[in-house]
Structure formats: C-alpha cells, structure tokens
Amino acid sequence: MTLKEIQRLYQGTGDFVAEGRLLDALQNLKKLLKESARPEFSFDWETLNDNYRTLLKYAFEGYEDPQQKAILHSISTSILGMADNLNNILMLRHLPFKRSEKARLTSIFGEDPMVISSRIEEFLLNQELEQLMEDTEISTGDDAPAENMDNIFELIWLTERIREYHTDLVRRVNDSPHVEWPRKCLVVSALTLSIFNYFDVQKILLLTEFIHKREQGVYQRALTGLLLVLIHYDRRLALHPELEVPLRELFRDETLRAEAELAFMQFLSARETEHITREFEQEVLPEMKKMMPRIEDKLQLGDITEGSDPDDKNPGWKEIIDDVPGLFEKIERFSRMQMEGSDVFMGTFSMLKRFDFFNPIANWFLPFYKENPVLFRSFPKDDPYHERLFDGLEKAFYICNSDKYSFALNFAIIPAQQRSMIVSYFEAELSQMKDFATEEQLLDQSLTSNSVIIQYIQDLYRFFKLFPSRHEFNDVFQGRVNFREMEFYKTYFERLPFIEKVAAFHFDRQHWEEALSMFGYLQEKSEPRTDIYQKKAYALQMMGRYQDAISHYRKAELFDTDQLWIANKLGWCYMKLEDYGEAIRYFEQALKISPDDPRLQGQIAQCHIQNHDYEAALQIYTRLRFFMPSNLRILRPIAYCMFVLGKLTEAEEAYDIILADPEKKTMYDYMNAGHVKLCLDKRKHATELYKLSVMGIDSPWTPFFHALDEDSKWLLKNGIHPDEIPLLKDFLMYQF
C-alpha cells in the first residue's frame, strides 16, 4: 500500500466517523489492519464491529436503550483511536526520518517506563544545576544541556499516547523557575507537533496549562499551537466533551480572545506567503536589479571618499526609484505589509537554513535570545560587532526567530570589514521601524504579545515549508480553511467583529469563494446592510456568477446609497451577460449621476457597437474625441464605425492618423485600415497593410482569416464582390 493510499484510508475513516457512517469507517479500518499485519488489533476490531452490529439490531427491533448514545460515542472514539495506531504503524514504514529518530531515542531512553522516568528526572536535575551555575557565574562550556533539550523535544514529539511520566515532565517544566523560558517554548512546540502526530486529549489539556501560566513568550506559543490543533482536529473535537469546559474557561478572558483572533488572522496571512514571495521576486527584484547600473553611476558608488558618511541618506535614491513606474509604490506596499505582519522575508531567508544549527528539529522552534551560547561560539571573542547584532536582532519584531538565527550565522561567515557596515545599516533600520510606531504603540504591552504570535507562526511556516524532512509532516498551512464550517469556532469564538475581519481579509486578498461564504455568514448573524450586499455582489461578479451578482447589486440598490457605483457594476454585469440593452440602461442611469464621466460614455458606446447600433456609438465617440483629440483609444472605434457606416473617406483619414502615431499598432489597426483602402479601390496599399497585420501575430493565418471572415459582411456592404475575398486570402498566402 502506498503512502497516499494509507493517508486516504486514514483520512476517510475520520470523515466517515464525523458523518456518522461507522460501517464505512470500520471497513476502512479493516483494510488498514490487513495492511499492518498486526494481529493483536484483530480482536479489538471484531469487538467494535460486533458492538456496532448489536447496537443497530436493538435500535431497529424497537428496544429502548438509554445507553445508545454513550455506546455510539464510545465506538466512534475507539475507531478513531485504532485508526491512529494503525496509521502510525503503517506511516512509519514510509517515513525514514521519524523512523531513525525513534530508533535513536530508544537507544537513549530505552523502552522501560522506569528508565525513561529516571532519565527525565536526570534532565530536570541538570536544568537546576545549570541555572545554579549561571547564577554563580560558573560556565561549563558544555554542549550537553542543548543536546539533552533536543532529546526531550523529540521524546515529547514522538510520543503517541502520553504517559504519566510525560505529563509529569511537561508540568514540572511549566512550573519550574529553573527551566529557562526558551526551553519551555521548545516543550510547547514539541507538544504541539506531538498532537499533530497523534491525537491525545491530555496533550491538548497540557497546552492549556501553559496558557494559564501566562509566562511571556511561552503562553503565546501554546495559544497559537492550541488554535492550530483546534483547526486541524475540528471534526474530532465533538467526540471529546471533556475539552469543552476547559476551553470555555480559557476563552472567557477577553485579552486571550483578542490574541487568539490575532493568531487566526496571522495564520490566514501566513497562507499567503508563497504568493507574496512570488510577487516580490517577479515584480520588485527584477526592477531593482535593472536599476543597479544606474544607481552605481548616479550615486558614484565607486568613488567613496574619506569624508563620506555611510549614514547619510542620498536623495538620488528616491529619484532613481521614481524613474521606474510603480516601483516606489510596490516597495512601500511591501514595507507596509511587513509592518502589519505579512511574511515578506521567506524568499530571502529560505536559502539560509543549511547551517548545522538547523539539523536538530528543535532548533527550528527555538526563540532567539542573545545569550544563546551557540551564537557566541560562531564568532571570535575579539569580534567587536556580533553583540551589537545580537542585541538588534533580539529587538527586531519584524523578523521571525528562525530567520534571526539564519541572519546571525550567516553574519559569522561575512568578511570582518563588511560587518561594521551591515550592523550600522541594521541598527538604522531598527531605529526607523521604531519611528513608525506611535508612542502609544511602544507602551502597549499587547504589541509584544502580538509580535511573539506573528514570529512564531512564521517560524512554524518555515518548518513546514523548508525542513529537509518536511514531507513527513502534515502541513498545517495546506488545505481549505473556512471558519464558518468549523464547530470549534462557532462554540468558542463566534462574534460579529471577528467574522467581519475574516471576511474583509479574504475580500482584500481576492479569495472570492471564502469572502462570499464569510459575508453570507455575517449576513445571517446581523441586520441587512448595503455594504455586505455590495461585497457579496462584487465577489460573485469576480467569480463570473453575473446573474447572482446582479441579484445582490439590486438588493444593495434598495438602500439608496452608492447608486453610481452600483449602477456601474450592474451595467458591467449585463455587458458580460451580453444583455446590452439593460447594460445601456444602467450606464445611462450612472451617467445622470456623473454626466462628465468619459469612461461611462465609452461603455455606453461600446454597448451600442455590440448591439450593432454604429450610428449611436459614433455620435458618442465623436463627442468624446472633442475633449480628448489625441486619444487613440477613442479614434479606433470612430474609424471602425465610419468604415461600417460607409464613411470611407473619413475612415481613411482616421486610420492614417492612427498608423502615423508612434504608439504601437495592433494587428487590427493594419487590418481595418486595409479594409478601408480595399473598399476605396486602393488595392496595392490595402495588401501592404494586410501583410503588416499578418506579420504582427505569432500564428498568422488562423486569427487573421477569422477576423477577415467576421468583417466580410462590411466589405460586401462597401462594394467588394463576394468572390474577391477568397482570392484575397490566397494572394496574401502567396506573399509569405
């Protein structure tokens, strides 16, 4: 059985249980059991199957069983539990990294619970001794604490059903004043990964204990992990009512709810990272690379004199950037996105995850702290810059922890003479970021909490996207997420402002289906609002569902606001449905509100052309040209309408102006000008224009002949004999 087949059966089992289709779930389970070749599960499967058959028998033979619901619940959870076990057994055969790490841990901890407990106790004692040495300024220079922490991380992560000694370890770490906060963060991350690896209610409850503790830097990670778990296991939570009370208690705290909402929004934002990276690399970087020769010349970068100050800002930068249309706005937009928490550095740092530091899985989740011994060991003791860099990185709220380590480790291999410049630039950048923040924001403690959540989600994103063995993990950033369909959201988080925030997020990022769903949800929960009808209509329009969009625009129209915008959109939708009469009606309605809008007049004229009312279209375009005489976009339809209406001399004059203009001509400019010359019996000139038309396209004959056939009726109307058109085609083909 392939990896995909195992995953399909396992996921299908969970779906069947959620839908109440337990027989189908049992059949899936039987296939997994057969593949596992583990007979010790056979008895459990037979018991579940018999219990379910008996329950159905009693139910449909008329027996009243007050325990039916409880038995059904027990069978469902048992099916899922067995599916978890079989899935882990089968998956391990296909996952070499997890398999090797499990074997390594067994060699360290063994399998005897007493031995494992003893090793855990030893770890906790070492933490206390290490803290004591730090308090008395005694340094061992030993790597053992970090290695021990890596082992504890993997022990928690690879644990399936949590045991008493695991629970004791996690709680003692949470409560201990001797375990540093970065290591507590690692335990939280290991616990989160462990839940994704194997569902266990006790693990979820342990995460909530870290949240209740409210230790700065730690609880935000636990909260984020908990929310990702709730998203991932939403359909399964209903089978575990023991979670409801603890979660309700937890999210009664308004501050915590606000932080949870931020984490949800940041999670949605992180799913945009690939798009942001692609946009930056395709739209901004190429333009900046093209600018480099001009920057070097204009700023005389090769002539740095002794008197130059590296901190002086050169006004030429802004001038050069302005030379590239739209570049400054793009850079400004990406800077704003960065300040708002968007992940704009993924592409930059993705190639800097190859340091040995990132070999242990735990280090992908390690918070950046400037006292980390790993950092100091990477630099010579006499290096004057690294402490300034570490201090700056620790304060840099806009860079995630994983990227901070990449930055610092890469800095260590940069030539010493360049380090000063980089540190100075980095400190200036950090200072500028602080300047963007208001005084109130700097004093707002919630911002610190927010930055922890944002950075942690970006750390998680890097792990799931860049870790060498990432394919052995379920990527929590993949798959469809619709809060409207999630029971945990309805139970613990549902409130109108957040629904609106999620809807706006999807709308702004052009996720039309999700936006439509969330605005529909908002509509169900609130009073009728014109802006909701408008946004739903616009989403439907962008999805190509024009008739539905019209229905919603008409409902928005009843509120008597934004009439110009609504009429314009209705006209556009009717155009797409090719109902040009209705389109004209709405565009004219909009024109009454904004009579001087040339765009509206152009749309009305376009509808007249589509309705073959060329005289009406020509009148409008002629009026528009009076105000914009040099606009070829207006002259083109004027020339074509004149040709169709038989005003050949005027059409010839118009096409002569179009072809003389330095603006790039289209295939149709040459073709239509050729039509006019042909009808005026200027055949040689006409064929030259037709040749230029053919030369302007990649695959010449099909689109050219198709357009020629469409226009043949106007050629016939203007005196060309029907037999002449096929001769014209053959003549042109001989020319190439």
Regions found by a protein language model. Name each.
Residues 369-560:
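Alpha-solenoid helical-repeat scaffolds
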Residues 1-8, 15-16, 100-120, 136-143, ...:
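TPR-adjacent "capping" and linker segments in tetratricopeptide-repeat scaffold/adaptor proteins
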Residues 498, 531-532, 566, 600, ...:
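TPR alpha-solenoid repeat register
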